[in-house]
């Protein structure tokens, strides 16, 4: 939902893939293949690999791929039961993009913050969030892929996440 642009006014213009397109200019074609509520976990409540956006992303055969998944995996329906599958599922996702375009450059993202005023924060979500961040770092190290830190720049700016989880257009 962060990639898709949930809660953003004029989403198609202001979601981060659209802003990235504006920054990069016409030399690049940036597409938004995010799906609101999607999980990285293939046994999660809404696996990204089962969404049409995933197949569209593979069919696009991107030269550059940015993956930001994991926030929805903090849901109690997902992490407690399937956490041990996270790294393998992530590597399978990466491999699918490599298979679609063997020359693709791929970046993984540390998740954007979840602030304490979010309703799920009081459950074990905070602990699971930190565990998932560690798993993402492990996957980046195991695959040799670069890691984009989306947490640190936003952590001190809760004003940029109106609902405590989804960045606004400025965020």
Regions found by a protein language model. Give the residues of each.
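Conserved beta-strand segments of alpha/beta enzyme cores
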Residues: 29-31, 105, 144-146
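Structural beta-sheet core signal
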Residues: 67, 107-110
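Substrate-gating cap/lid alpha-helix
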Residues: 113-150
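Hydrophobic positions in alpha-helices of CheY-like receiver
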Residues: 93-97
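A short helix->loop->beta-strand "cap" motif at the edges of active sites that frequently abuts
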Residues: 100-106
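Conserved SGNH/GDSL esterase-like catalytic core that processes O-acyl groups on lipids
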Residues: 2-91, 127
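Residue-level recognition of beta-strand->loop/alpha-helix junctions
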Residues: 32-34, 110, 149-151
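Histidine-centered active-site loop/cap adjacent to the catalytic His
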Residues: 146, 162-171
């Amino acid at each position: 939902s962060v990639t898709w642009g949930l809660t953003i006014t004029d989403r198609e213009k202001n979601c981060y893939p659209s802003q990235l397109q504006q920054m990069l200019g016409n030399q690049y074609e940036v597409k938004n293949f995010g799906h609101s509520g999607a999980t990285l976990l293939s046994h999660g409540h809404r696996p990204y690999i089962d969404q049409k956006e995933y197949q569209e992303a593979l069919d696009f055969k991107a030269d550059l791929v940015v993956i930001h998944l994991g926030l929805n995996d903090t849901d109690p329906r997902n992490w407690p039961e399937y956490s041990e599958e996270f790294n393998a599922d992530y590597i399978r996702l990466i491999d699918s993009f490599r298979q679609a375009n063997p020359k693709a450059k791929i970046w993984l993202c540390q998740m954007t913050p979840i602030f304490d005023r979010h309703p799920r924060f009081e459950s074990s979500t905070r602990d699971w969030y930190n565990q998932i961040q560690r798993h993402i770092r492990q996957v980046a190290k195991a695959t040799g892929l670069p890691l984009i830190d989306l947490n640190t720049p936003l952590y001190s700016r809760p004003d940029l996440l109106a609902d405590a989880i989804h960045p606004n257009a400025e965020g």
